[in-house]
Amino acid sequence: LDEGGARLSEAGVPDAGTDAWYLMEAAFGIDRVHYYLDQNRPIHAERLEKGYGRYQEMLQKRAERIPLQQILGMQDFMGMTFSVDENVLIPRQDTETLVERVLRDYPEKDLKLLDMCTGSGCIAISLAVLGGYQNVTAVDISEAALRVAKKNARRLFLIQKGTARSESFQ
């Protein structure tokens, strides 16, 4: 962990120690609570070897400034965890503000909502789940982005809410 934090710090990664923690948790499949509670518990050699190799790969990607969320494959948004990859933008706090405003200002559940360039689907899915909107459509020109959105919709049991592909948005 110290080695990972130092490596990221040398690469100029902000919050290097925190990022090293997140990467270690993902690589070894342990969380901080278990790490501290079970410090003296040995890790099986196979798990240690596999985890260490994965940790080194993840550290290298982060040192190359690949976003942490992209390496981990997930980002929390509006209290839900969304899958993300290099084909979509990482959901951000300012986008949560947009969703919160829609939820506050448009309480009618029968509205037809369209999320253009949906990416991960975080806006459309959040509006459907948190707002209870019955007609939410998410579209994107990128098939790769739509795969991510569909994965998120399936995981949150919303695939029937609609994910479509369009060549143009005229």
Q: Which residues are covered by each model-predicted region?
A:
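A general secondary-structure junction signal
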Residues: 22, 75, 166-168
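A general structural signal for well-ordered alpha-helical segments in protein cores
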Residues: 1, 20, 55, 65-68, ...
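Conserved SAM/SAH cofactor-binding pocket of Class I
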Residues: 94-170
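Short alpha-helical
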Residues: 15, 90, 143-144
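Non-catalytic accessory regions of SAM-dependent methyltransferases
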Residues: 1-41
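Conserved AdoMet
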Residues: 25-104
